[in-house]
Swiss-Prot record:
InterPro entries: Asp/Glu/hydantoin_racemase, Asp/Glu_race, Asp/Glu_racemase_AS_1, Asp/Glu_racemase_AS_2, Glu_race. PROSITE patterns: ASP_GLU_RACEMASE_1 (PS00923), ASP_GLU_RACEMASE_2 (PS00924). Its EC number is 5.1.1.3. One of its GO terms (molecular function) is glutamate racemase activity. The keyword Isomerase applies. The active site is at C72, C183. Keywords: Cell shape, Cell wall biogenesis/degradation, Isomerase, Peptidoglycan synthesis. Pathway: Cell wall biogenesis; peptidoglycan biosynthesis. This is Glutamate racemase. Provides the (R)-glutamate required for cell wall biosynthesis. It catalyses: L-glutamate = D-glutamate. Substrate binds at D9, S10, Y41, G42, N73, T74, T184, H185. Pfam families: Asp_Glu_race (PF01177).
């Protein structure tokens, strides 16, 4: 049996990354965990985000995944480097791929980033952007109302438009030509965001993250070559039917393999740690 790629997120937003991986790598099986019961992660203390993320990682390791994608910007900012240091499988985050894409696209070297409170407070995007181009100007804005909006299924219409317009008001007239959606929930609001910022190029990290996953699989000779069609499994700490409906209606991900799970307490991950 082929070893799957593991993907984790604070909820359903990581499906925007999962769908892009499924599109670019159709032979690769995926195991996805979305922690909708404890979403959003953005306002939570760092140690809580760390604990929740490691619980999901532990569950993925019991699924014998060959790679982990942290498809949550808040969790990427908190856990990515320590996960890479401690695990013996590749771990991919979503921050640097988004930063690379923004630098490539921006013509005036002026980029804005919107994200959760935790992601913006971490300065992870600013550091990633400056590591690529130290002269790029960066605007950052937390938009804490976006994730709850998406999780409740309000991605268009008057309510979504009003929340997005009010949240983005501080960025109006700032002079940037490129906007990074620094949360994997936000691409589901992309049409509404683009309507508020019509002259700005909007970047989501899913496509670039999928490219990095593909490159790492080939580099480590882990890419699936024989399977005709991949089988995917999805887990949520929330309500399985709601997850299934949102995945189908928003991202055209149709699956009967959605199960509700409970994550509580640290899971034994030591067996997969790198030997000292």
């Amino acid at each position: 049996m082929s070893r799957p790629i593991g993907i984790i997120d604070s909820g359903i937003g990581g499906l925007t990354v999962a769908s892009e991986i499924m599109r670019q790598l159709p032979k690769e099986p995926i195991v996805y965990i979305g922690d909708s019961a404890r979403c959003p992660y953005g306002p939570r203390p760092v140690e809580e985000v760390r604990a929740f993320t490691w619980q999901m990682i532990g569950r993925l390791l019991h699924e014998d995944v060959k790679m982990i994608v942290i498809a949550c910007n808040t969790a990427t900012a908190v856990v990515l480097e320590e996960a890479r240091a401690q695990l013996d499988i590749p771990v991919v985050g979503v921050i640097r791929p988004g930063a690379i894409s923004a630098i490539q696209v921006s013509e005036n070297r002026h980029v804005a980033v919107i994200g959760t409170i935790g992601t913006i407070a971490s300065n992870a995007y600013t550091m990633a952007l400056h590591s690529i181009d130290e002269n790029v100007t960066v605007e950052s804005l937390a938009c804490p109302l976006f994730v709850p909006l998406v999780e409740q299924g309000t991605i268009k219409g008057p309510e979504a438009e009003a929340v997005v317009r009010e949240s983005l008001a501080p960025l109006q007239g700032a002079g940037f030509d490129t906007l990074i959606l620094g949360c994997t929930h936000y691409p589901l609001l992309k049409p509404v965001i683009e309507a508020c910022l019509p002259s700005v190029t909007v970047i989501s990290s899913g496509e670039e993250t999928a490219r990095e996953v593909s490159s790492l699989l080939f580099y480590h000779s882990m890419n699936e070559q024989h399977q005709a069609k991949a089988t995917h499994r999805f887990y949520t700490t929330g309500e399985a039917n709601q997850f299934k409906q949102l995945a189908a209606s928003w991202l055209n991900i149709h699956t009967d393999s959605v199960a509700s799970i409970h994550l509580d307490g640290p899971l034994p991950v030591q067996a997969t740690m790198k030997s000292k």
